[in-house]
Amino acid sequence: VYDSSGKLQLQIEKGLDADVFFSAATAQMNALKDEDLVDADSISNVLENKLVLIKGKDSTTTVTGFDNIGDASIIAIGDPEVVPAGSYAKEALTNLGVWDSIQDRLSLAGNVTEVLSQVETQNAEIGLVYATDAASSDKVEVVAECDNSLLATPVLYPIGRVSSTKHKDEADSLIKFLKSDKALKVFKKYGFKKGE
């Protein structure tokens, strides 16, 4: 099942029949671990990503980076309550000191694909997504990469075995494969880095 990590977390909490949870953030994984819904000993950070500021290819925006992000008329981000990229965006914008002043210009999306779409179609002047998402679209370009100093933790993608799985061996095999050099080679092709 593919969806935002927050939505997948909620589905697992409601009993979704799943074997493995591959999250785009540590918060959702930690919540499921704390609820004993993911086996703690199976969790590892497989990948790392970056948060980036994007604009449409044909955009005439004057926003040149995080320093003047407040100049944007509409800023698309994932909903911070359910979308990890949105949570990271909120953290970065809060640490920049602009979160409160841009509330009326935020367009909250249900996942990063919706953020991309809003920027691609210029329904939003700019957006905040992961670098790998930006790289997947030929209709957007990266304006700036979020400085790590704006985030308390790096953008890590943990994976873990769902405690209720009836397929423990298969889940462990999948996790082992996704952590392998062979899989990492493919992930790197799409802009990911090895997680810590």
Regions from the PLM with identified roles:
Residues 6, 10-14, 25-26, 30-36, ...:
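Exported/periplasmic ABC-transporter solute-binding proteins
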Residues 19-23:
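Periplasmic-binding protein-like
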